[in-house]
Amino acid sequence: MASSSSNRQFSHRNANTFLTYPKCPENPEIACQMIWELVVRWIPKYILCAREAHKDGSLHLHALLQTEKPVRISDSRFFDINGFHPNIQSAKSVNRVRDYILKEPLAVFERGTFIPRKSPFLGKSDSEVKEKKPSKDEIMRDIISHATSKAEYLSMIQKELPFDWSTKLQYFEYSANKLFPEIQEEFTNPHPPSSPDLLCNESINDWLQPNIFQVSPEAYMLLQPTCYTLEDAISDLQWMDSVSSHQMKDQESRASTSSAQQEPENLLGPEA
């Protein structure tokens, strides 16, 4: 099977974006500058990049991006840098995301001024809005709009809804198969036609020898004790082939292919 492909449009719309670049050794400062330039149209306010190490020693990169206007993209490759593709999520709680990024960094780079959740530039002040925990519907809506593969979809559900993932995994796998169906590989003929020989004789012979019963002169000599030489065996086999071929032709010539069969002649009965 080929890699899976989504049957719906990727969508990201948020002023707070959380990016994770797996197995990415890029310098955080360089990554920050590249991401900053990508979102100039949405007026970037703050970006934080941190490089961390996996248990196996490989490096990955986390980034928190804040813009004055919500970033609106439908291209899942929009935030790719130097060939590295990130996992893109909405940062529902920028404070927790920032703390998570800064937990064990090997290298960090920041640009701009961090804006806590529900700050005035987003339209409401801290006193007007209380932090609200997102509902399961909101979490799933965000996962569906951001996941770009079956594995990523299930991984995001496991992270955001661990209890539901552990008790309803078969349902999530079903929805993952619907969102990211497997692409059937196009059939490739192992024996493409060639000119002037349109058949691959080697492959036909490889199949012919073990699958079609053939009597060799040597085998015939073993079955016929009165046949003493190879020439006699070849002569007998040629004679049998000729006789059987003529018999087949005679049978075909006598066979009727007409639907109108000849009726028997009506004989006169005895005179009264």
From Swiss-Prot:
A motif (RCR-3) lies at residues 100-103. GO terms for biological process: DNA replication; rolling circle single-stranded viral DNA replication; symbiont-mediated perturbation of host cell cycle G1/S transition checkpoint. Its cofactor is Mg(2+); Mn(2+). Residues 175-187 are annotated as: Oligomerization. The lineage of its organism: Viruses, Monodnaviria, Shotokuvirae, Cressdnaviricota, Repensiviricetes. It comes from the Viruses. It holds the Pfam family Gemini_AL1_M. Its main location: host cell. A motif (RCR-1) lies at residues 18-21. A divalent metal cation binds at E52, H60, H62, E104. A motif (RCR-2) lies at residues 60-62. It is found in: Host nucleus; Host cytoplasm. Divalent metal cations, possibly Mg(2+) or Mn(2+). Implicated in enhancement of V-sense gene expression. Acts a an inhibitor of C-sense gene transcription. One of its GO terms (molecular function) is metal ion binding. This is Replication-associated protein A. Belongs to the geminiviridae Rep protein family. The active site is at Y100 (for dna cleavage activity).
